[in-house]
Amino acid sequence: ELGRSRKKSEYKKREPELHTALLEVQRRLRLGSSHNVLIIISGVEGAGKGAVVSRLNTWLDTRSIRTVAYWSESDEERERPWMWRFWRNMPPRGEIAIMFGSWYTQPIVDCAYRRIDEDVFAHRLARIAELEHMLSDDGTIIVKFWFHLRREAQQKLLADEQGKKSQASPYTRKF
């Protein structure tokens, strides 16, 4: 989308090598590492986040990964501190957690829809930074991915999805 792409044939040629390298990193992590890995997958609707999460779950050894999708808060989560829903899914040492959605989602959405002002938004981002520093200091390797589409490309994708009446669209989530 943004010009940073590989030809499909080139990717397919390197795919086994990339898969093997990723499994080797996971194996080394699992065998006595003092670290854990948190992979954060966020971005705009339709940008391919789900495909990447599926690929990671296919490629990695699922015995030492946990994938968590964050959508609307549950009643239990609403009655607890804001970060609790994320904190309880942190991976133990030697393991990987994949967060599909993250602690960035709600502040960004709330700011975009003007439900919070800039000061509240800045405060929430500062709290997120504090959490990430704490996790990093404790040995968590945080890998963040933001998936983006130009507005025109996203609108075309969503319009194409609306045209497909025979299947349920994954792009109907409300905030």
Per-segment meaning from a language model:
Residues E1-F175:
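Glycine-rich phosphate-binding loop of ATP-dependent small-molecule kinases
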